[in-house]
Amino acid sequence: MWFLILFLALSLGGIDAAPPVQSRIVGGFNCEKNSQPWHVAVYRYNKYICGGVLLDRNWVLTAAHCHVSQYNVWLGKTKLFQREPSAQHRMVSKSFPHPDYNMSLLIIHNPEPEDDESNDLMLLRLSEPADITDAVKPIALPTEEPKLGSTCLVSGWGSITPTKFQTPDDLQCVSIKLLPNEVCVKNHNQKVTDVMLCAGEMGGGKDTCKGDSGGPLICDGVLHGITAWGPIPCGKPNTPGVYTKLIKFTNWIKDTMAKNP
């Protein structure tokens, strides 16, 4: 959520050094083409705002703090600012933020210690199904708890530098470690709850950042989280990022999808 607040502040402040986006990968590398076929670029009109994850042909999962009045998505992209034959564009017919997410946090404000970013996820219903190809494939929800110490991969088009807002064209990937939540509790002022995951590199330098919100956290090959919030500047030592823990929400996700075919 801090990523979105900073993104909005930069946009409203007239920053023109880079196209406006939300959060981004620091310390990463260009993802191999088609290696993240579930990764979705979420737009408000023609402005990229967040990442997302394709769960099936009709549904995208993203962060609730990415909530805006209108959405459309691009699937199968590896380059944000270029046309690609593999890419598919879809409108979003309806959005479903988690009912327990505190939407008042969307008002721009300085993060406070009492802020609780729990339940930060949202489903987007596509107006027409995605075509499944080598570049566009869904990923399954988790069926068990993630293992501490797992190697996790995060991806996104968020800022590639921790302080100066700089967006990449190529989809970025970075490997980080799944850490005990106590590490994030100790090193963040905001609440870290049992519906969140703590992941990063304690030495710093590798992190999600401004523009990565809603993108996938894949640990040992399994989708376990989506990017939620983290430190500013991104990639600070001893301050891992915080992710929504999807195993806590699989029933809500499945029920919402089933009730809105």
UniProtKB/Swiss-Prot annotation:
The keyword Protease applies. CDD domains: Tryp_SPc. It holds the Pfam family Trypsin. Keywords: Disulfide bond, Glycoprotein, Hydrolase, Protease, Serine protease, Signal, Zymogen. Its EC number is 3.4.21.35. GO terms for biological process: proteolysis. Residues 19-24 form a propeptide. Residues 25-258 form the Peptidase S1 domain. PROSITE patterns: TRYPSIN_DOM (PS50240), TRYPSIN_HIS (PS00134), TRYPSIN_SER (PS00135). It catalyses: Preferential cleavage of Arg-|-Xaa bonds in small molecule substrates. Highly selective action to release kallidin (lysyl-bradykinin) from kininogen involves hydrolysis of Met-|-Xaa or Leu-|-Xaa. GO terms for molecular function: serine-type endopeptidase activity. The keyword Hydrolase applies. Disulfide bonds join C31-C173, C50-C66, C152-C219, C184-C198, C209-C234. Belongs to the peptidase S1 family. Kallikrein subfamily. This is Kallikrein 1-related peptidase b11. It comes from Mus musculus.
